[in-house]
């Protein structure tokens, strides 16, 4: 007996519809109208749609059970949760705000944490708030303070005791790590799990699902304390723009909070002398698939170079990093680890980001190791070329295509630390642009070596576009 042939491609909508319509004459001879307007055909097509959807989910069930193949965000979140990895939400951009006086005051002026400032742009307004207190001494006229992008929001709830459900927050773009919870004016601590929580541990968890809905979860009274019935719960968080919060220097110019000294309002000027960097949208599934196994291999402890790299690149706000030790440079001492850190969106990392990352790594490193964080060096690569276009091509359009191709080639997301720029790749890139006949490259003339701690970036572009003879 021959082996039965099973068709695995007849479970979609069209295949189900054809098969069901073909079976109708076998069941009855009274149904002869198969127009799309027929009520029976409408019902049949509805069942075909449901069957198509069920078949898809059944086929995808096996793929959704494994992290490398899962495509639905909620399934990736659940799989990562099994290995104690949590996908990052939006990350607030950080910068330094400089507060300036017209003349020194007779006393020290304290600018409290939470002072808000604004950058007015054509698209929208971007608000920053200081992350720490800053003081202008009476002999000086300015001070710099670290700041994060976002608007502070507060919500109040009432605890319902043992029957209470998780608290659902209204904010959808909550900055990663910005949630703070008070129960009866007593602050509780956020944890990633309740495994090490006791019955009196004032701990809570913040969980965000695939729809960006954030829930505050308390313990059950055994693993983590449970708020008393009727207790007031106050939740405070920062709502951020993510990657849109990255902006250039000297754009934050408005002070929204009032600053007083001895009851009098003090006029202050504000600006950001350095760019705002490190802002990022919620973590992508591709990044989670790559980062979660790397952090599991490190066991969240920094011992090897791979451990430091995994922990640094998994830190919110860090796009890429490079780890250097004594094996890479003779000037580096034993038991010293140097990290070049590039923030999300490119540019230099802010002082606030480096402080947070240093504290994070300090708690996970070997006690004898010294960690040094430094800014990346963006190595400009200038392009000087003579480009010959086919007859009939618009020369300005060809030029814009080449400029766009170069911008895409040197995009920050594509470049990695220490990766050389090959001459042949640049020639092939320009020669492959639509409308280009051939290219004569003057600069560069050979491969460009990029040293450790450096990232290639597009420099000056000089293109002589002419028609091919």
Kindly label every feature range from the protein language model.
Residues 1-469:
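Signature of Asx- and small-polar-rich beta-strand/turn repeats characteristic
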